Design a protein with these regions (language model features):
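Acidic-and-aromatic substrate-binding clefts and catalytic sites of carbohydrate-active enzymes
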Residues: 103-111, 130-140, 164-172, 209, ...
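Divalent metal-dependent hydrolysis catalytic cores, especially in the metallo-beta-lactamase
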Residues: 95-101, 114-136, 154-162, 187-194
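H/E-rich (His + Asp/Glu) clusters that bind or coordinate divalent metals
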Residues: 260-412
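Acidic (Asp/Glu)-rich catalytic clusters
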Residues: 87-89, 115-121, 140-155, 176-186, ...
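Bacterial N-terminal signal peptides
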Residues: 6-15
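Histidine-centered divalent metal-coordination motifs
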Residues: 96-103, 232, 292
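Active-site gating/metal-coordination segments in enzymes
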Residues: 140-259
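N-terminal pre-domain segments of enzymes
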Residues: 23-93
Length: 412
């Protein structure tokens, strides 16, 4: 059902030749059985939308379905398109999942063995756990990994940073903890969570902005240690927009209301993104990896401009396959142009979802399903990347920017 705008009648009185004349805009369309030329439906004026429960079947002619309309959850049309299908169960080249969230699988020897079994089935050579671990939690995870003959060269961990109560004395402690975590075996920073810049408060109660100068010593330390910073900023722009039927993510936001960011409670999307971009510019010697393609996979021109202006910026593809796969030509060209600065990552660890990534990246298949209905109601297309680009995406770029990753198990 589409919302339609109420046409407000504006009456103006004018005296012409001694008579009173009333002027009024065209009233809202009323449902009828016939449109222009005798066609079935309801006629509307240019610029108007169809009344609720109707759709435009011809220019300016609306009609409602004869049968009761299904809900958005129940409408699941089956495509009759017959096209080539290339199911890709394993990656063509050994991959590094730079955006791993293995969760409890790193908590025990049995769990980490199970993780390796899953990775083997997908041809994922290595997972970088981006669970914001630090201190004892990080050491415990590394102990489990290093005790496993199968996992010790297959799993690495990023170090977490706590941004709570930033204020006097915070930076010195944060840098010392980061140095200790790297010495313990962490290979970078991350995943810096989306609360950073949205809801995290400083010691004085103010919102912690992404480009706050109190944080500069931490980003400078990352440059000195030669480690990348993996940062997730905010959420898709649609999450900041009104929840109406024109919002492309209406279903997701209705299923998960905690993902909404109303402007009266949170900073605006563009405000947070401006702070992020300023952070990247302020620290040109620090390598930043923007998670989820910076939430600009739906605007590759904007992301391209960022990449051109910020040579220290890299990006990662986790959880934005729905945008990559609906613009195959533009995505193909983007991945080729910036082939040295894009990393593979999956985000949530669901082994059955990885093959969708392989299919989008490796084939030219058309019009196939995405793996989660609530993310996208549209179909995907393969972007058919050439082998040299696939190799950089899957493993070479990660090996290049993360010195702490083992080099074994990859093509020479």
């Amino acid at each position: 059902m589409r919302a339609w705008s109420v046409v407000i009648a504006v009456a103006s009185l004018a005296t012409i030749s001694g008579s009173l004349r009333s002027q009024q805009q065209t009233p809202p369309p009323q449902p009828s059985n016939r449109g222009p030329g005798g066609a079935r439906g309801t006629q509307i004026q240019p610029g108007q939308e169809c009344p609720p429960g109707m759709t435009e079947i011809r220019p300016r002619n609306c009609l409602g379905p004869e049968a009761p309309a299904p809900s958005i959850l129940d409408y699941r049309p089956k495509s009759t398109l017959i096209a080539p299908v290339h199911m890709v169960k394993t990656a063509k080249f050994p991959a590094i999942d730079y955006h791993g969230h293995p969760g409890g699988l790193l908590g025990s020897a049995q769990g980490v063995e199970s993780l390796i079994s899953y990775l083997d089935s997908l041809n994922v050579r290595m997972m970088v756990a981006a669970d914001n671990m630090s201190g004892d939690r990080l050491k415990n995870a590394l102990a489990v990994i290093n005790a496993s003959p199968k996992a010790k060269d297959r799993v690495r961990v990023l170090a977490g940073i706590s941004f709570q109560n930033v204020g006097p004395g915070w930076a010195e402690k944060a840098v010392a903890q980061l140095e200790a975590d790297i010495a313990a075996g962490a290979v970078g920073v991350g995943e810096v969570g989306k609360g950073f810049g949205l809801s995290t408060k400083k010691a004085d109660g103010s919102r912690l902005k992404l480009d706050d100068p109190d944080l500069d010593p931490v980003w400078d330390a990352a440059a000195r240690l030669n480690i990348p910073v993996f940062i997730h900023t905010a959420d898709p722009q649609e999450f900041f927009e009104p929840i109406d039927y024109s919002n492309e993510r209406w279903l997701e936001l209705s299923l998960f209301p905690e993902r909404r960011y109303p402007n009266d409670k949170f900073p605006k999307f563009e405000e947070v993104m401006a702070e992020r971009d300023n952070l990247f510019r302020k620290h040109p010697k620090t390598k930043f990896v923007a998670a989820h393609m910076g939430w600009h996979a739906n605007d590759l021109g904007r992301l391209a401009k960022m990449m051109d202006q910020m040579p220290n910026l890299y990006t990662e593809v986790g959880a934005v396959l729905y945008d990559i796969g609906r613009q195959p030509r533009a995505a193909h060209d983007f991945f080729v142009k910036y082939q040295d600065r894009i990393l593979f990552g999956k985000d949530s660890f669901q082994p059955e979802e990885y093959p969708y990534y392989w299919r989008v990246f490796e084939t030219a298949d058309e019009y196939f399903d995405y793996y989660r209905d609530y993310h996208a109601f549209w179909k995907l297309y393969g972007i058919d990347l050439p082998d040299p680009v696939l190799q950089k995406l899957y493993y070479k770029n990660a090996l290049k920017i993360v010195p702490g990753l083992p080099k074994t198990g990859f093509p020479k």
